[in-house]
């Protein structure tokens, strides 16, 4: 199989990895209520935090990020950078639209970071710093993610990573789409702040 022919395979493998709903799995194993029935209904770490279980939220964040990192590292090792980017896109789509949960998944922030970490780690550091700075000043997880993801493609472009910049521009658009309800709540002043329980 040629390297270019591997791209669809990388996309599918990435999707399958990304579609593993770690937030839902961890909260069920811990005996908490269905994470989809509280807060934003998302299966991601921020919504898991609303259960009051910080350890579960941290575990969800780590495992969701690893989905993106593992996908791009494995695909890149097998078939090069284009396959890595395809796997990253697949992992992101899998997390947002998992077939096992009727295509209703998470918001994609942790996976976004994990993909960045696997493809160009300095950008992941910048993303996290931007997220932390925004979260510290506003205490809005959603706004922090929107700000950090908006700047990430420009950061990649500035340092000459044009293909990565294009990929993350697409991922940022998808992330904004996943946060569309959060954006509405931010505009109306009804968005939950970090640490608030459901």
From Swiss-Prot:
It comes from the Bacteria. Coiled coil: none annotated. It catalyses: an acyl phosphate + sn-glycerol 3-phosphate = a 1-acyl-sn-glycero-3-phosphate + phosphate. Keywords: Cell inner membrane, Cell membrane, Lipid biosynthesis, Lipid metabolism, Membrane, Phospholipid biosynthesis, Phospholipid metabolism, Transferase, Transmembrane, Transmembrane helix. Its EC number is 2.3.1.275. One of its GO terms (biological process) is phospholipid biosynthetic process. Pathway: Lipid metabolism; phospholipid metabolism. It is found in: Cell inner membrane. It is a multi-pass membrane protein. The chain crosses the membrane at residues 6-26, 56-78, 83-101, 113-133, 155-175. Belongs to the PlsY family. Catalyzes the transfer of an acyl group from acyl-phosphate (acyl-PO(4)) to glycerol-3-phosphate (G3P) to form lysophosphatidic acid (LPA). This enzyme utilizes acyl-phosphate as fatty acyl donor, but not acyl-CoA or acyl-ACP. Probably interacts with PlsX. This is Glycerol-3-phosphate acyltransferase. The lineage of its organism: Bacteria, Pseudomonadati, Pseudomonadota, Alphaproteobacteria, Hyphomicrobiales.
